[in-house]
Amino acid sequence: MAGHSKWKNIQRRKNAQDAKRGKLFMKLAKEIYVAAKSGGGDPASNPSLRLVIEKAKAANMPSENIERAIKKATGTQEHTNYEEIRYEGYGPGGVAVMVVCLTDNKNRTAANVRAAFAKNGGNLGETGCVSYLFERKGLLVIDREQHNVDEDELLLLAIEAGAEEMETTDESFEIYTAPESFETVKDELEQQGFTFASAEITMIPQTYTTLEGDDLKKMLKLIDTLEDDDDVQEVYHNLDESVLEE
């Protein structure tokens, strides 16, 4: 994985989402609701809930919003049944796109996702058409300004805790784990005094596609359109966004 900062692409996406904070909080509340409903409202015994709560806190979601979503899921009132659906397709220039949705209306969601692709130079594909281009990984990002630590020392700590590898950029250390090792590595590094700019299980592209001109504009519009949809939780893609820094 060396030579390309996956966190840069993810961070750029998160910054765009932060600009739409109200919508982001709504989506996080839905994710908390689903996790609490399926695994219980105690984060100590529900790893999925614990992880999404940490993600919500990292996004500065108010604690009362988090508690409200948990209480809604574990209370006696009528529950909303959300279903997770994944769509796969191609953006302009053959960029691979995976869209993760939580929806209570599959027909509405399918129509909206299909329209987003069609209007922005892409097309939906069959299940599995691009998923093989991504790998599910735990990603822990440590801000270098916040931690005065030797790179080799941190790498040794991470590997001993169960991490697979670490990448270093000017701004951060990016530690990658297998999904099943994520909590163990995270807990061990926290015990060593580290905090994280981001901690999540995500989909990492194995290769990247570079676009320019109209194709790049259409691809960015496709991402924005999908992320604006209330049913869409995550948009993963293999667009090389480093060109946006130039």
From Swiss-Prot:
Biological processes annotated in GO: regulation of DNA-templated transcription
Annotated Pfam families: TACO1_YebC_N (PF20772), Transcrip_reg (PF01709)
GO molecular function per UniProt: DNA binding
An annotated GO cellular component: cytosol
UniProt keywords, alphabetically: Cytoplasm, DNA-binding, Transcription, Transcription regulation
Principal cellular location given in the protein's record: cytoplasm
Disulfide bond residue pairs: none
Domain of life: Bacteria
Family that this chain belongs to: Belongs to the TACO1 family.
Protein name in the entry: Probable transcriptional regulatory protein GK2594
Organism field: Geobacillus kaustophilus (strain HTA426)
The organism's taxonomic lineage, starting at the top: Bacteria, Bacillati, Bacillota, Bacilli, Bacillales
